[in-house]
UniProtKB/Swiss-Prot annotation:
Belongs to the ABC transporter superfamily. Fe(3+) ion importer (TC 3.A.1.10) family. This is Fe(3+) ions import ATP-binding protein FbpC. It is a peripheral membrane protein. One of its GO terms (molecular function) is ATP hydrolysis activity. It is an enzyme of class 7 (translocase). InterPro entries: AAA+_ATPase, ABC_SmlMolc_Importer, ABC_transporter-like_ATP-bd, ABC_transporter-like_CS, Mo/tungstate-bd_C_term_dom, P-loop_NTPase, Transp-assoc_OB_typ2. It comes from Brucella suis biovar 1 (strain 1330). Its EC number is 7.2.2.7. Part of the ABC transporter complex FbpABC involved in Fe(3+) ions import. Responsible for energy coupling to the transport system. One of its GO terms (cellular component) is ATP-binding cassette (ABC) transporter complex. Residues 9-239 form the ABC transporter domain. It catalyses: Fe(3+)(out) + ATP + H2O = Fe(3+)(in) + ADP + phosphate + H(+). Keywords: ATP-binding, Cell inner membrane, Cell membrane, Ion transport, Iron, Iron transport, Membrane, Nucleotide-binding, Translocase, Transport.
């Protein structure tokens, strides 16, 4: 394999309709070369349609798609200089790992010997050197996934597309393989467009996350930006659970805001907040609970569940039920206990209305 040539991706006012249904209404986005960008969102948000448009498996109703600055809008899939890793891996069961990786090269016109050499190099690249003789059935789920990645990379695409590549793996293997994908992408420097509905997966692998909703971009930013500074209640709750309650921003200056919640004042990062009514996103682990509620923000224990290293509570308050994660597992709070809710310094974000 020669050096990776990472390419940029640009969608310019792309609309995709299926009959009378508009899956993507006027979508514009940019992916910088050498970055891993994740399209994240609930089912039906348009993330897979976006990936399929980029792959050439669908064509836009209007707008332009560029890869590496080249207009590929009307090009077939095999002329776009992108490779895709499918959710099912799509490995041929009767072919060895080496034959699977070499297949795309041979189909592209490489001589058999050169295709085999490149395939062997590709397998080494993903940590499967010496395993080219094995059939897919003789590999673990994680190894099959790496064969699929190797098959895509040996074609030396400008952009690698990954369509929910970890969805068929169990939770423990998923964590390990997502780390391997991220390390490989950083080591080789290729551009990757990654689709998932798993927030933890997106946070772990991405340079940039694009959260999609109803065919549009709800928010784009780094994993830290989206988690710590959500632009809306939807983003706050989607990027890890969040309790959203009304608040009033009293003042905001020098990067710090003073807010009032349930009659009590608190200091939180301002993040462009303005003095006016707003909402406060509260992460489940951003509060402590104290028995015997006094004034201010208080509630009653409605439900608790012991999960080994933490206890999950539902607290009934005047603003509805709050979901709280408490690492203090020595003794759980009994049901119907009145509690005061105290904020920690992290895990709070103002959402401007």
């Amino acid at each position: 394999m020669t050096a990776i040539r990472p390419g940029s991706v640009t969608f310019e006012n792309v609309t995709k309709k299926f009959g009378n249904f508009t899956a993507l209404p006027n979508l514009s986005l940019t992916v910088e070369p050498g970055t891993l960008v994740t399209l994240l969102g609930p089912s039906g948000c348009g993330k897979t349609t976006t990936l399929r448009l980029l792959a050439g498996l669908e064509h836009p109703t209007s707008g332009r798609i560029l890869v590496g600055g080249k207009d590929v809008t009307n090009l077939p899939a095999n002329e776009r200089d992108v490779s895709m890793v499918f959710q099912s891996y799509a490995l041929f069961p009767h072919m060895t790992s080496l034959e699977n990786v070499a297949y795309g090269l041979e189909s592209s016109g490489f001589k058999k010997n050169e295709a085999r050499e490149r395939a062997e190099e590709g397998l080494k690249l993903v940590g499967l050197g010496g395993m080219g003789h094995r059939l897919p059935a003789e590999l673990s789920g994680g190894q099959q996934q790496r064969v699929a990645v190797a098959r895509a990379l040996v074609l030396e695409p400008q952009v690698l597309l990954l369509d929910e590549p970890l969805s068929n793996l169990d939770a423990r293997l998923r964590r390990r393989v997502r780390t391997e994908i991220r390390e490989l992408q950083q080591r080789l420097g290729f551009t990757a467009d990654y689709v998932t509905h798993d927030q933890d997966e997106a946070l772990a692998v991405s340079d940039t996350i694009i959260v999609m909703k109803e065919g549009g971009i709800a928010q784009k930013g780094s994993p830290r930006d989206l988690y710590e500074a959500p632009a809306s209640a939807f983003i706050a709750d989607f990027m890890g659970e969040a309790n959203v309650v009304p608040c009033e921003v009293i003042s905001a200056e020098n990067g710090e805001a003073v807010i009032r919640v349930a009659g009590l004042t608190h200091r939180v990062p301002a993040r462009n907040a303005q003095p006016r009514p707003a909402q406060l996103a509260i992460r489940p682990n951003a509060v402590t609970l104290q028995p015997q509620a006094g004034g201010g923000f208080s509630g009653t224990v409605a439900h608790s569940a012991y999960l080994g290293d933490h206890i999950e509570y539902e607290i009934e308050t005047e603003h509805g039920k709050l979901f709280i994660v408490d690492p203090a597992v020595e003794q759980s709070l009994p049901l119907q206990t009145d509690v005061s809710i105290q904020f920690k310094t992290r895990g709070l974000a103002i959402i401007n209305q």
